[in-house]
Amino acid sequence: MPEEYLNAQKMEKLERIKSRGINPYPSTFHPSHTSAQAVALLVEIETQENHLKEVLKLAGRIMNRRDMGKISFMDIRDGSGKMQIFFRQNDLDEASIELLKDLDLGDFIGVEGSLMRTRTGEPSLAATKVSMLSKSLLPLPEKWHGLQDVEKRYRQRYLDLISNADARQTFLTRSRVISVIRAFMNAKGFLEVETPVLQPEAGGALARPFITHHQALNCDFYMRIALELHLKRLIVGGFDRVYEIGRIFRNEGISTRHNPEFTMMESYQAYANYKDVMDFLEEMVSSVVKEISGGYTLPFGDITLDFTPPWPRLTMRDAVKQYAGIDFFDFPTKETLAAEMTRRKLKVDPAKDWGKLVDELVGEFVEPHLVQPTFLTDHPVAMSPLAKQKPEDPRLTERFEAICANMEIANAFSELNDPVEQRARFKEQLEKRSQLRTDESESVDEDFLAALAYGMPPTGGLGVGIDRLVMLFTNHDSIREVILFPALKDREDTKTQE
């Protein structure tokens, strides 16, 4: 960091602290309590009328300071919350009095003292000693308004977390959502596993991968675009129920709903089909909502989302008929469907195949109507290369997407376990990929096909978008709000302090 950006007054105070033989950045301090524990202890003492003056040690960042002659008040914050510290010069040793003069907002301090309440009833610690733990050399964002620049909030998330209680709560909620999902999966007998992030083949989804080169092996690897194929290998290997919560990487566009790296939970269950998985997802999400919110509803923007089971179920064909007025099977080729969409004044991307055009219709006409949790089922085969066909209509697959707040939050299907059919689907998928890009070599995942050839039982697979799910729990309409460090375009003027 260029020295000219450091606050001059803070630097002077830093030098004064050093001149008194104090290390402004000591290696440790051992608090006896968190702020939340200290407040709870004060309530317990008052309830029991126990007036013993136990000495506590607290630590945190100075967020507010008020000086009144020989008395000072500071609010310090740790990971559990805020605590007011009461300083009276008569109670402090000389070293603490001198140090007090050189403390600023943003500094980390350790304090020792006993609990009390002020005349206004504020829980406080009456300090008898203060220690310097870390001297802040840059000013914090303005106290009352926090950090308002949205892009700066994302680029400098640490300032956002310091300044905005809502941001801190968002990521506490995110952590809890993942923990509750994990507990639910474990209770249902699923084994949590870890599969490779670096893979020799980019499989499991139709998406552009990130490519990296392994120097020692002298070969390229792909960062995974899905968890699917390795998890299904484990079903082949004899684990009946497996899941993974992990990062996925797709070298594609950025939007309020898409980030190049994102978190998925994928699970695979032997001897289940997509209807079983539908019931399972419905139970899981509604249970997580109830565990975290106390009921089955969540506020989202101007509406209330109701996750009470059962959720509505709508076939994709019926949905597109209802909201777009098109039966896509009346237009069975890319050319005929594109012509019909053009006739209806819809923009058509000539690079997209028939399945992608159907997906466009769903995104344009269907998803805007699906606000409450809804299952969209029975996708065309062209859109679902890894899903089983429906026996009663081989043009369709046993697949569903869960839509909520106009966006997909989960995707699942009865897994294709016929190795011959899977090879044919892979080859078709490969042709589609080659049409999307010509700068990368592509190949079929032969090892996965070999695994299928040894036999995989009927299996229901599920993928849940953790980031989008957290958006619902935290009432955010942008994925960047729920990812600690979202991908952003490089900007030269943010490389130095603004």
Curated annotation (Swiss-Prot):
InterPro entries tied to this protein: Aa-tRNA-synt_II, aa-tRNA-synth_II, aa-tRNA-synth_II/BPL/LPL, Lys-tRNA-ligase_II, Lys-tRNA-ligase_II_N, Lys-tRNA-synth_II_C, NA-bd_OB-fold, NA-bd_OB_tRNA
Names of the cofactor(s): Mg(2+)
Catalytic activity of the protein: tRNA(Lys) + L-lysine + ATP = L-lysyl-tRNA(Lys) + AMP + diphosphate
Keyword Chaperone belongs to the record: no
Keywords: Aminoacyl-tRNA synthetase, ATP-binding, Cytoplasm, Ligase, Magnesium, Metal-binding, Nucleotide-binding, Protein biosynthesis
Locations listed in the record: Cytoplasm
Superkingdom, natural source: Bacteria
Keyword Ribosomal protein: no
EC number: 6.1.1.6
GO cellular component term, pick one: cytosol
Main location (coarse class): cytoplasm
GO BP annotations listed: lysyl-tRNA aminoacylation
CDD domains: LysRS_core, LysRS_N
Gene Ontology molecular-function annotations: ATP binding; lysine-tRNA ligase activity; magnesium ion binding; tRNA binding
Ligand binding (Mg(2+) 1): E401, E408
Matches recorded under PROSITE patterns: AA_TRNA_LIGASE_II (PS50862)
Cofactor: record remark: Binds 3 Mg(2+) ions per subunit.
Annotated residues for binding of Mg(2+) 2: E408
Top-rank EC class of the record's enzyme: ligase
Family classification: Belongs to the class-II aminoacyl-tRNA synthetase family.
Subunit composition and interactions: Homodimer.
NCBIfam families xref list: lysS_bact, PRK00484.1
The protein's name: Lysine--tRNA ligase
Organism of origin: Dehalococcoides mccartyi (strain CBDB1)
Lineage of origin: Bacteria, Bacillati, Chloroflexota, Dehalococcoidia, Dehalococcoidales
